């Protein structure tokens, strides 16, 4: 009996402890909710205060920026004045003064000699370029005549060389395409051009 009574006494405090544990859990949840609510209120207050402060700073800094920046009308007027000045300077430089004209008239001919010298050098350069171009064309025509079915010592004109070359190219193209009609036509045309080149050479 004593052992049973002791077991009952031991079990009763266990039941009491579990009940207290449930109450403690509820109290912890309530405390957490209270802390979260207080944090939320704190954040709301701080955010509102920060927003007001930033708005005040922005409104205070805006007039300073407008004071530092020059107005648009002033800048436009300054640009127009600068453009007018530059145009006037260009006109003054382009229009020769009477003193300059008199200097040109009373000069001893040095300016004219310089101009003549420049014209001569330009003419020499143009002639040299033309000679170079003609020499290059002659070389190219000589290379083309080597590829054509004409005699090596034949001297035909450049126009006749081009006509023979076009007929010969058409004849070779017809052979590659295996077109007998075009081949015969271009062959006749090539023979005609070769005969014309020979008669012109004589």
UniProtKB/Swiss-Prot annotation:
Compositionally skewed regions (Polar residues) per UniProt: 17-26
One GO molecular-function entry: DNA-binding transcription factor activity, RNA polymerase II-specific
Origin: domain of life: Eukaryota
Region (Helix-loop-helix motif): 135-172
InterPro entries recorded: bHLH_dom, E-box_TF_Regulators, HLH_DNA-bd_sf
Self-association and partners: Heterodimer with hlh-2.
UniProt xrefs under PANTHER family: BASIC HELIX-LOOP-HELIX TRANSCRIPTION FACTOR, TWIST (PTHR23349), HELIX-LOOP-HELIX PROTEIN 10 (PTHR23349:SF109)
The protein's name: Helix-loop-helix protein 10
Organism lineage string: Eukaryota, Metazoa, Ecdysozoa, Nematoda, Chromadorea
């Amino acid at each position: 009996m004593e052992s049973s009574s002791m077991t009952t006494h031991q079990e009763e405090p266990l039941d009491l402890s579990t009940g207290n544990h449930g109450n403690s859990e509820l109290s912890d949840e309530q405390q957490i909710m209270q802390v979260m609510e207080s944090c939320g209120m704190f954040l709301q207050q701080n955010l509102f205060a920060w927003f007001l402060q930033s708005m005040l700073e922005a409104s205070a800094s805006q007039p300073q920026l407008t004071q530092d920046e020059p107005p648009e009308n002033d800048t436009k007027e300054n640009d127009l004045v600068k453009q007018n000045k530059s145009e006037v300077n260009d006109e003054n430089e382009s229009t020769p003064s009477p003193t300059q004209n008199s200097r040109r008239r009373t000069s001893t001919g040095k300016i004219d000699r310089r101009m003549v010298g420049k014209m001569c050098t330009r003419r020499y350069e143009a002639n040299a370029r033309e000679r170079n171009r003609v020499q290059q064309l002659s070389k190219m025509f000589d290379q083309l005549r080597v590829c054509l079915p004409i005699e090596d010592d034949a001297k035909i004109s450049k126009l006749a060389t081009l006509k023979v070359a076009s007929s010969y190219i058409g004849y070779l193209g017809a052979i590659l395409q295996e077109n007998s009609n075009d081949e015969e036509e271009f062959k006749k045309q090539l023979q005609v051009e070769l005969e014309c080149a020979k008669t012109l050479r004589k």
